[in-house]
């Protein structure tokens, strides 16, 4: 079936790196199409890279263009509930995302990962280990390189990180293995509630051969009503069943069906959440027919991703930890649960809270020798959580205030539990700024 047979006009909604990748892909593979781009921002990112012959409308919607479209490719940041998108859907016109276009074009096996937390680390490590096992692999999607740009590479396997937003507009993605890591409250400004959010995540199993789910979080299991009879489930968790953790030779080991694989202490990654992440990677590789034992040396030397519990400065016995990727409550909870701090912890929280309830942090914070530093648009929401809470406007103000007090054994940690869009372009920019300040004051 030629999916493009009746499509003559395509409107791409939202520019940026994803929108540009869509335009490049369409020009290369479907040069006969008329492609137009709408971005409601007055000066969208990437506008200078758009080919001059592509029609562009900025600053508002262009209903006339949408009314003429045979296909609309929307950015994951734009909700399907947006009235202009609903009008398109009511006309019976397909609204897809870049991942759906990737699914139409990909001709090699695909592994995909979703979940509220840990998906970037799992995606990256799966790719690193697959390559170490001799399987040429490309990593992308919601992490780093847009999925469509991966099609330019000569590879044997694709590994994609997928957000719930991307899954909403994806219906044809066939996967050799799919993982749903965990579910915790996030994006409640976009979804009707937790079940709505969960249903978006569960779409990852729609055309998957193997599903990797979390024994410690039953919400990750697909419902039988989804009709995925052919889906083979593989589980991971903190006990010793399937992919899990067992006691061996007097210490904790990662295991498969109660057979030891690797001692937990051999991992460079810190925290219990990262042990779970590694188990998922081992499960995904197994599902894809890759012998993970060939990649264990790569696993042992893997230090994790930038902006994820990353030590950016360590001077005079004071550690500065950049966990800017912690854009929700559960990420910050995970970072704190695996923490080893000899002195006082100076914890920086705040930003764009996305309508979340942060009160579950209170019992964890109560156990720590802590100075809670609250900044950004929703910093006030953290003030009732600890007696030490102090309010600041910007991250720079926090560092300037605390730096004279720091002593050997202390830790300064940015794990904001919030999105960055109130003061930064993204979590990377926020983390980079923190790293700059750390180097300046360390």
From Swiss-Prot:
- Name its pathway: Cell wall biogenesis; peptidoglycan biosynthesis
Q: Name one GO molecular function term.
A: UDP-N-acetylmuramoylalanine-D-glutamate ligase activity
**For this protein, what is the EC number?**
6.3.2.9
**Domain of life of the organism encoding this protein:** Bacteria
The reaction(s) this protein catalyses: UDP-N-acetyl-alpha-D-muramoyl-L-alanine + D-glutamate + ATP = UDP-N-acetyl-alpha-D-muramoyl-L-alanyl-D-glutamate + ADP + phosphate + H(+)
Gene Ontology cellular component terms for the protein in this record:
cytoplasm
Keyword Chloroplast set for record: no
Q: Which organism is it from?
A: Vibrio vulnificus (strain YJ016)
Where along the chain is ATP bound?
A: 115-121
> Its Gene Ontology biological processes?
cell division; cell wall organization; peptidoglycan biosynthetic process; regulation of cell shape
| Protein's recorded name | UDP-N-acetylmuramoylalanine--D-glutamate ligase
The gene behind this protein is murD
Where is this chain's protein located in or outside the cell?
Cytoplasm
């Amino acid at each position: 079936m030629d999916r493009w047979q009746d499509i003559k006009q395509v409107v791409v909604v939202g520019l940026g790196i994803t929108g540009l990748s869509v335009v490049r892909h369409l020009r290369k593979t479907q040069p006969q199409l008329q492609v137009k781009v709408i971005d409601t921002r007055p000066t969208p990112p990437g506008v200078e890279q758009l080919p001059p012959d592509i029609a562009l409308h900025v600053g508002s919607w262009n209903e006339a263009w949408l009314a003429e479209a045979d296909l609309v490719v929307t950015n994951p940041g734009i909700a399907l509930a947006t009235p202009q998108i609903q009008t398109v859907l009511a006309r019976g016109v397909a609204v897809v995302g870049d991942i759906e276009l990737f699914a139409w074009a990909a001709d090699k096996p695909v592994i995909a990962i979703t979940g509220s937390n840990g998906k970037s680390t799992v995606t990256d490590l799966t790719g690193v280990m697959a390559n170490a096992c001799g399987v040429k692999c490309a990593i992308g999607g919601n992490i780093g390189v847009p999925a469509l740009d991966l099609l330019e590479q000569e590879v044997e396997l694709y590994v994609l990180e997928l957000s719930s937003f991307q899954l909403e507009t994806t219906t044809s993605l066939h996967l050799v293995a799919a993982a749903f890591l965990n579910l915790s409250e996030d994006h409640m400004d976009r979804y009707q509630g937790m079940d709505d959010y969960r249903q978006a995540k569960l779409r990852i199993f729609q055309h998957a051969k193997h599903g990797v789910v979390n024994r410690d979080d039953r919400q990750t299991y697909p419902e039988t009503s989804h009709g995925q009879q052919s889906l083979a489930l593989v589980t991971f968790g903190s006990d010793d069943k399937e992919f899990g953790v067992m006691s061996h030779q007097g210490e904790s080991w990662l295991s498969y069906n109660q057979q030891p694989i690797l001692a937990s202490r051999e991992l460079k990654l810190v925290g219990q959440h990262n042990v779970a992440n590694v188990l998922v990677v081992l499960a995904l590789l197994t599902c894809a027919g890759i012998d993970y034992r060939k990649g264990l040396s790569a696993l042992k030397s893997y230090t994790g991703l930038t902006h994820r519990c990353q030590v950016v400065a360590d001077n005079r016995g004071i550690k500065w930890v950049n966990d800017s990727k912690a854009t929700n409550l559960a990420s910050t909870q995970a970072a704190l649960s695996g923490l080893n701090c000899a002195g006082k912890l100076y914890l920086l929280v705040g930003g764009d809270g996305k309508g979340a309830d942060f009160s579950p942090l209170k019992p964890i914070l109560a156990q720590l020798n802590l100075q809670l530093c609250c900044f950004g648009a929703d910093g006030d929401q953290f003030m009732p959580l600890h007696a030490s809470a102090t309010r600041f406007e910007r991250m720079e103000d926090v560092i300037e205030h605390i730096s004279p007090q720091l002593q050997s054994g202390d830790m300064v940690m940015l794990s904001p539990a919030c999105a960055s869009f109130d003061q930064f372009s993204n979590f990377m920019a926020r983390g980079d700024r923190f790293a700059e300040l750390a180097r300046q004051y360390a």
